[in-house]
Regions:
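Acidic/histidine-rich alpha-helical segments that form the ligand environment
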Residues: 91-141
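Short, contiguous alpha-helical
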Residues: 2-19, 23-33, 37-40, 45-89, ...
Length: 162
């Protein structure tokens, strides 16, 4: 199958999660929500490094997302990075300095930008590949929610009645 018919939808949903929702309506986030990247920009390295009772941190969530998107980006250029992927590595980087936090956010921003380009580009895919593409959006939404449970400074606006 070809993604031409669903590329605009995939791009809209991923972009909303990463870059924020328009004030006049949204599909996943509340209207006017700033999205993942600007939410992370609100945090200091110290806040991003705060460990949860389970041993993770927002810094680790951000690195995990960066790693997963780097795999998707490599796949989109014809590689098969999944056979040798080591997801556990991204969870080991729980604490960051100020410079490491700036770098981690910049790297995540770059991977999200590359993946948006890939989502916009129609391609022939197998069912398993389409599942991975759609799964990448759900995966990012899950981690955005987890990050927002860890630190309320990252939370978006409450839904207002219309």
């Amino acid at each position: 199958m070809n993604t031409a018919d669903i590329s605009p939808t995939l791009t809209t949903l991923f972009s909303e999660l990463v870059n924020g929702a328009p004030k006049d309506g949204a599909y996943i986030l509340n209207a006017g929500d700033e999205g993942l990247l600007r939410s992370l920009d609100k945090l200091s390295a110290q806040a991003a490094s705060a460990l949860t009772p389970t041993g993770s941190s927002i810094a680790a969530h951000a690195d995990h997302l960066r790693y997963g998107l780097s795999l998707m980006n490599r796949w989109s250029t014809g590689e098969n990075p999944f056979a040798t992927a080591d997801w556990s590595t991204s969870w080991k980087k729980t604490t960051v300095s100020d410079e490491e936090w700036r770098t981690r956010r910049a790297e995540l921003r770059a991977e999200t930008s590359r993946w948006l380009v890939a989502l916009r580009t129609p391609r022939d895919v197998q069912t398993i590949e389409l599942n991975g593409i759609i799964g990448s959006i759900a995966h990012l939404a899950y981690h955005l929610g987890a990050i927002r449970q860890i630190d309320q400074a990252t939370r978006g606006p409450k839904e207002v009645s219309r």
